[in-house]
Protein backbone atom coordinates (compact mmCIF):
# COMPACT_ATOMS: atom_id res chain seq x y z
CA UNK A 1 0.00 0.00 0.00
CA UNK A 2 1.21 3.50 -0.76
CA UNK A 3 2.28 5.91 1.93
CA UNK A 4 -0.73 7.38 3.73
CA UNK A 5 -1.05 11.11 4.35
CA UNK A 6 -2.31 12.13 7.80
CA UNK A 7 -5.36 13.83 6.27
CA UNK A 8 -6.44 10.45 4.84
CA UNK A 9 -6.26 8.61 8.19
CA UNK A 10 -9.90 9.23 9.26
CA UNK A 11 -11.07 7.65 5.98
CA UNK A 12 -9.55 4.33 7.08
CA UNK A 13 -12.13 3.91 9.86
CA UNK A 14 -15.47 3.14 8.20
CA UNK A 15 -17.56 2.42 11.32
CA UNK A 16 -17.55 0.72 14.68
CA UNK A 17 -19.19 -2.68 15.02
CA UNK A 18 -21.77 -2.91 17.80
CA UNK A 19 -23.04 -6.45 18.50
CA UNK A 20 -23.52 -8.53 21.63
CA UNK A 21 -20.10 -10.09 21.20
CA UNK A 22 -18.28 -6.78 20.66
CA UNK A 23 -19.99 -5.23 23.69
CA UNK A 24 -18.58 -8.08 25.80
CA UNK A 25 -15.15 -7.39 24.30
CA UNK A 26 -15.36 -3.76 25.48
CA UNK A 27 -14.82 -4.97 29.07
CA UNK A 28 -11.33 -6.16 28.10
CA UNK A 29 -10.53 -2.93 26.17
CA UNK A 30 -11.06 -4.55 22.75
CA UNK A 31 -12.83 -2.31 20.22
CA UNK A 32 -14.08 -3.52 16.83
CA UNK A 33 -14.09 -1.40 13.66
CA UNK A 34 -14.68 -1.90 9.93
CA UNK A 35 -11.95 -0.84 7.51
CA UNK A 36 -11.42 -1.02 3.74
CA UNK A 37 -9.98 -4.32 2.51
CA UNK A 38 -6.61 -2.89 1.44
CA UNK A 39 -5.72 -1.21 4.78
CA UNK A 40 -2.73 -2.56 6.71
CA UNK A 41 -2.58 -2.96 10.47
CA UNK A 42 0.14 -0.30 10.76
CA UNK A 43 -1.89 2.32 8.89
CA UNK A 44 -5.02 1.47 10.88
CA UNK A 45 -3.07 1.75 14.15
CA UNK A 46 -1.89 5.23 13.14
CA UNK A 47 -5.47 6.21 12.29
CA UNK A 48 -6.86 5.03 15.65
CA UNK A 49 -4.07 6.68 17.65
CA UNK A 50 -4.41 9.94 15.72
CA UNK A 51 -8.20 10.13 15.78
CA UNK A 52 -8.92 9.04 19.37
CA UNK A 53 -5.61 10.06 21.06
CA UNK A 54 -5.08 6.61 22.62
CA UNK A 55 -2.23 4.05 22.75
CA UNK A 56 -2.90 0.84 20.80
CA UNK A 57 -1.30 -2.37 22.12
CA UNK A 58 -2.30 -4.77 19.35
CA UNK A 59 -4.58 -5.19 16.35
CA UNK A 60 -6.18 -8.38 15.02
CA UNK A 61 -7.68 -8.30 11.54
CA UNK A 62 -10.25 -10.54 9.88
CA UNK A 63 -11.10 -10.56 6.19
CA UNK A 64 -14.88 -10.75 5.91
CA UNK A 65 -16.30 -13.02 3.18
CA UNK A 66 -17.67 -11.59 -0.05
CA UNK A 67 -21.49 -11.32 0.08
CA UNK A 68 -23.52 -12.09 -3.02
CA UNK A 69 -26.56 -9.97 -3.87
CA UNK A 70 -29.17 -10.31 -6.60
CA UNK A 71 -29.28 -7.52 -9.16
CA UNK A 72 -32.41 -7.83 -11.24
CA UNK A 73 -33.93 -11.19 -11.95
CA UNK A 74 -30.97 -13.28 -13.08
CA UNK A 75 -27.77 -11.35 -12.43
CA UNK A 76 -25.78 -11.51 -9.22
CA UNK A 77 -23.47 -8.86 -7.87
CA UNK A 78 -21.37 -8.53 -4.77
CA UNK A 79 -21.33 -6.11 -1.87
CA UNK A 80 -18.15 -4.14 -1.04
CA UNK A 81 -15.39 -6.01 0.74
CA UNK A 82 -14.42 -4.98 4.26
CA UNK A 83 -11.92 -5.99 6.88
CA UNK A 84 -12.84 -6.23 10.56
CA UNK A 85 -10.20 -4.82 12.92
CA UNK A 86 -10.17 -5.67 16.63
CA UNK A 87 -8.09 -3.09 18.49
CA UNK A 88 -6.69 -3.73 21.98
CA UNK A 89 -5.92 -0.53 23.88
CA UNK A 90 -3.50 0.26 26.67
CA UNK A 91 -4.89 -0.31 30.18
CA UNK A 92 -5.35 3.41 30.94
CA UNK A 93 -7.01 4.41 27.63
CA UNK A 94 -10.66 4.16 26.55
CA UNK A 95 -12.73 5.13 23.52
CA UNK A 96 -16.20 6.49 24.20
CA UNK A 97 -18.42 4.83 21.58
CA UNK A 98 -21.74 5.63 23.27
CA UNK A 99 -22.88 9.20 23.86
CA UNK A 100 -24.35 9.97 27.28
CA UNK A 101 -27.19 12.45 27.14
Curated annotation (Swiss-Prot):
SUPFAM superfamilies linked: Ribosomal proteins S24e, L23 and L15e
Major site of localization recorded for this protein: plastid
GO BP annotations listed: translation
Lineage: superkingdom: Eukaryota
InterPro entries registered for this protein in UniProt: Nucleotide-bd_a/b_plait_sf, Ribosomal_uL23-like, Ribosomal_uL23/eL15/eS24_sf
Localization of this protein: Plastid, Chloroplast
Keywords: Chloroplast, Plastid, Ribonucleoprotein, Ribosomal protein, RNA-binding, rRNA-binding
Job description of the protein: Binds to 23S rRNA.
Protein name: Large ribosomal subunit protein uL23c
